[in-house]
Amino acid sequence: MGIRSTVGRTLDRVLGPSTVQRLRRAEVAGRRRLINLLDVEARVASRSSERRASESATGQQRRAELIDALGRRSLADSVNQEGMTWATNDPFVPHPPATMTRHQVLQQLHRALAPRTYFEIGVRWGDSLALSRARSIGVDPAFKIRCELHCDLRTFAETSDDFFARADAFDHFDGSPIDLAFIDGMHLSEFALRDFINVERRCARGSVVVIDDVLPRNNLEAYRLRRSKSWAGDVYKLHGVLRRLRPDLVLVPLNTKPTGTLVVVNLDPESSVLQDAFDGLGDEFTSPDPQSVPDDILTRRVAVAPELLLASDVWQQAVELRNAGAADVGPLWKQLDALPRLG
């Protein structure tokens, strides 16, 4: 028989059952109070949880205030990355994982096309220029080349608009058209379209143009006024505009890291369609933030796996036709329209 049972029966005889029952209830209540007083870890955890919730709410408020403040800056400030603090990005919209970067795609295109001339807008550190072995021109108002280059190069430290206004802009190419171009300049749709118009005029039917940042991963990356460190701007609008106004072009969006790439072929240097329509696109291009990015862009259903594009035998045939001076390569380029999309 247990000691507690023996003591309990003895107390029942001496004090009476009702008194003993009151004492037992008081004992249980006392034990509970003591446990609560001694459970320091639980009380600290509770306070920590409350503090984290408060800090999270404060952090979200500060982030919202920062995004609002950044949105009141000028367009010029949106490209000034030096010494600026950006808001943390939003979660990315789910999309198929990209297996290649833009530079890896560009490198493979250099190998496949062996371009005689290469033109680039947006030199920055020179990482993409380093891929070229052709006679090359690079345009960027603030480039800081930090890598070894291996091409016959002329650079212009000015905006692309100023460059295209020069009478001697393409003298370095000695009259040859652009074989391969990479547009990675100002991340605003009207600038990107103007760059494409000017580049196409100096291309041939067999030329290839690559445009970066056409597949933002969330709406914040697509803001016209930069808020986050990772920024694509509203260049994504180019895909819709080109598809609508220039159905003759072959457009192949690629699922590349980080923010997608657009390959454009079947060019027509004589076309004036885009230039004629440019002024009428103002409202569409300059729509205020936040931008309404189409779902097939965010999810990349519209895109092609870059490996499929690069594996096509179109490239070898395109080089042969280019070197032979063939004028009509449209049927060849149209084969790329058959590449399966991720959606």
Name each region found by the language model.
Residues I3-F182, M186-V210, V214-G343:
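A short alpha-helical cap/connector motif
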